Amino acid sequence: MEPDNPLLDLYILRQAGTGRPKICFVPTASSDAQGYIDRFYDAFQRLECTPSHLSLVQPPTVDLEDFILDKDIIYVGGGNTKSMLAVWKERSVDRYLKTAWENGVILSGLSAGSICWFEEGVTDSIPGDLTRLEGLGLLSGSHCPHYDGEADRRPSYHRLIQSGQIGGGIAADDGAALHYVDGVFHRAVSSRPEAKAYEVRAMEGHVVEAVIPTVYLGEAGRAMI
């Protein structure tokens, strides 16, 4: 949902393989902020899809599982990852999302909505230093978003990996996205020419960072996928 840059949004919609995919925004991490919901509709009502959202403050239905499973794509927004996961667990949304994933529904998101799918991630949900947070575990390894967008993300991820507090994994600059198929890393894509993804792991007492080839979705890059 980058303003005036729909490249990643279009990429997500294309993965559904249908003419007008049903995409549902889940704004739990922002406490269902209305402004955030409005931004989602502003972005996706312009595109070939059927947008909706799932509020847990004012649920659209009693049967949340059926509501989720009816969608082609779930798009989870950013905010407080720790609080989001706690609310999901209380309402069984975590289980419903896993069932959706097992049934072929595309799970996507940004920031908190990216961290949540992994075994663990780097979060600012707790005041103070960035810390490890356990995710849903649908994707193996750890994840760190905002790798270039926030000054303390890269050093904090390195610190946590080197100290053994978190396992190795994949980091992503703002504007970069990680595409997994059946739980296996498939490719990295980006909406910005300079945005990259990185493999980050501990080796012989040091943290090793390697750039993952990242396809820019603008210009000729769109023809490569």
Spans of features found by a protein language model:
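Portal/gating segments that form or line small-molecule/metal binding sites
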Residues: 24-83, 87-89
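A short acidic, amphipathic alpha-helical/loop segment
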Residues: 11, 63-67, 96
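Residue-level marker for well-ordered alpha-helical positions
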Residues: 38, 62, 94-95, 155
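General beta-strand structural signal in soluble alpha/beta enzymes
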Residues: 52-53, 75-77, 107-110, 169-172
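C-terminal and late-domain segments of enzyme folds
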Residues: 1-20, 25-46, 73, 121-123, ...
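Alpha-helix/helix-capping structural signal
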Residues: 79, 112-113, 176, 183
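Class I SAM-dependent methyltransferase SAM-binding "motif I" and its flanking Rossmann-like core
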Residues: 80-154
